[in-house]
């Protein structure tokens, strides 16, 4: 049980890194972080990070009887792809984001929340094969809460420290997802046991 909780928390932190990085970027452009802006950021990112794994879970559940014999390969491929993409994106410079002023209305937050949650959809697919329904509910709640907290913290960190933490956070999140994907594959192949 402790192992499952640790896995869920690691997944939650990893999935939250995109929203954290975007929030740091938004924090760079504000003179001060208003409470209502932190709440909006928390609700947008946390809410979408909860919604997309649910959608991924239901998509996977619908087709699970067809893919259970190779689900570990799906989990491995998705987590390694998502993690690798996060690491790759960390090394790409996005000059548009650095020049954009932080706005928190729905026209600005909706595309960011969706973009940051695409990975969470794929993680939801993976979670459908990894956990029971009860564990899945805890995972979805954990992903939403952790993402919300990280996005609020990202605003403050971006405001206080600048862009120094944006790239390392995204790289760390990507590496953790890659390692989790490798762990799932090695467990299924009987190389390791947890």
From Swiss-Prot:
Keywords: Cell membrane, Ion transport, Manganese, Membrane, Transmembrane, Transmembrane helix, Transport
Pfam families in alphabetical order: Mntp (PF02659)
CC terms in the record's Gene Ontology section: plasma membrane
GO molecular function: manganese ion transmembrane transporter activity
Taxonomy, superkingdom: Bacteria
Keyword Cell membrane among record annotations: yes
InterPro entries xref list: Mntp/YtaF (IPR003810), Put_MntP (IPR022929)
Topological category with respect to the lipid bilayer: Multi-pass membrane protein
Localization per Swiss-Prot or TrEMBL: Cell membrane
Listed transmembrane segments: 2-22, 43-63, 67-87, 111-131, 137-157, 174-194
Main location: membrane
Similarity remark: Belongs to the MntP (TC 9.B.29) family.
HAMAP family: MntP_pump
Function of the molecule: Probably functions as a manganese efflux pump.
Protein name: Putative manganese efflux pump MntP
Gene name of the record: mntP
């Amino acid at each position: 049980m402790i192992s499952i909780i640790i896995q869920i928390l690691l997944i939650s932190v990893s999935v939250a890194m995109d929203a954290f990085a975007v929030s740091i970027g938004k924090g760079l452009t504000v003179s001060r972080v208003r409470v209502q802006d932190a709440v909006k950021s928390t609700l947008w990112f946390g809410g979408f990070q909860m919604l997309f794994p649910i959608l991924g879970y239901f998509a996977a559940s619908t087709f699970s009887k067809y893919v259970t014999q190779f689900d570990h390969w799906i989990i491995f491929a998705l987590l390694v792809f998502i993690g690798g993409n996060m690491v790759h994106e960390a090394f790409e410079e996005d000059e548009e984001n650095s020049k954009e002023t932080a706005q928190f209305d729905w026209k600005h937050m909706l595309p960011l929340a969706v973009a940051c949650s695409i990975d969470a959809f794929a993680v939801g697919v993976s979670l459908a094969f990894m956990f029971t329904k009860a564990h899945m509910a805890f995972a979805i709640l954990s992903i939403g809460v952790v993402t919300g907290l990280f996005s609020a913290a990202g605003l403050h960190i971006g405001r206080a420290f600048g862009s120094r933490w944006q790239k390392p956070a995204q790289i760390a999140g990507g590496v953790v997802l890659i390692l989790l994907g490798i762990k799932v594959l090695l467990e299924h192949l009987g190389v390791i046991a947890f």
